[in-house]
Amino acid sequence: MITMQHLSPQEIYKLMATYIVPRPIAWIVTQNEEGLINIAPFSYFAPLSSTPPSVVVSIGHKEDATPKDTLANIRKSKKATICMVPQEFMERMHLSSKALDANVSEAEFFDIPTIEKIQEFAPMVEGVSVAFFCELLQEIDLQGSSTVPLVLEIKHTFVADNPQTPIARIGRSYAAIGEALKAPTLGE
């Protein structure tokens, strides 16, 4: 038995990231006040409710303890576009996890094309087959946490004609979702 209070935050993260799997990846697109596009992946992300349609994503801080650009942008604009990551975008998505200066756009730096779908929201990554256009519903204050959970309400959803299966996170690796297993029937 492992007592969590005896572990460091890094050990807790490793334990949770290894065994709470697979974790979907929210490839979040935001814009700052000047319209600069920020794109970053987050795997502490999950559906939360269908009424209202919402997800939760936990966003950490930079090494200097200031909010990551994604968090700062969502706090200011109250909006985010979450793209699900198809396998063909894995490398660019992974590159976009690199910390850049706030005045540098991941879209430009890593050559990630975007396309505007809804004027009042950040653009989506061009070529992804599923995107959620969200508004900030609630920021959760977890006392002592190094991450900030955000509840984002889904206002619009884009689904391509032939949506691709998104990749997921398993530990520190990525995974393609494979064969679907049929659920056993329940006795009456």
Predicted regions and their residues:
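Basic, polyanion-binding surface patches
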Residues: 1-188
